[in-house]
Regions:
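Alpha-helical cap/lid subdomain in secreted, periplasmic
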Residues: 1-86, 98
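Conserved catalytic region of serine esterases and O-acyltransferases that act on ester linkages
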Residues: 76, 80-87, 91-135
Length: 135
């Protein structure tokens, strides 16, 4: 319907992320041994969905979380599965801003967070988003 009514519109899907390492949901409810295995399944599912429904691009939110976690920053969840009010939401906001506007996030000065975020975490989030958006 969107393509019929707005043929020039770009259609995207928002990729979700893996649950927090060692959480009940991840290990018991879903049976994963670690968040990396879950993320690999999430990524594959979104790639398949994108192809099946012919979207123009994926907003790689799960990829941002995964990169932050792999860099040693693990405070991206607030309750083992939702984005934290601080770093998680900030990283997602940077990603959406960069993807939708085409602007570089490295000079972004936003700093009104719902939870405290260290300067190191702010810079790491910007770095992860900038790397993803340059691919």
């Amino acid at each position: 319907y969107v393509r019929l009514c707005m043929p020039k519109a770009k259609i995207a899907i928002h990729q979700t992320w893996a649950y927090e390492q060692d959480s009940h949901r991840l290990n018991i409810e879903l049976g994963y041994k670690n968040h990396t295995d879950m993320f690999e399944d999430v990524r594959a599912s979104y790639e398949k969905a994108a192809k099946d429904i012919k979207v123009d691009f994926i907003i790689p939110s799960g990829e941002v979380f995964q990169r932050l976690i792999e860099s040693g920053i693990e405070k991206v969840h607030r309750d083992t599965f939702h984005a934290s009010y601080g770093l998680g939401r900030y990283a997602l906001g940077l990603l959406w801003y960069s993807i939708l506007s085409g602007n570089d996030v490295k000079q972004n000065t936003f700093c009104d967070f719902d939870e405290e975020i260290s300067k190191t975490e702010i810079e790491k989030a910007k770095e992860c988003v900038a790397e993803l958006c340059s691919i």
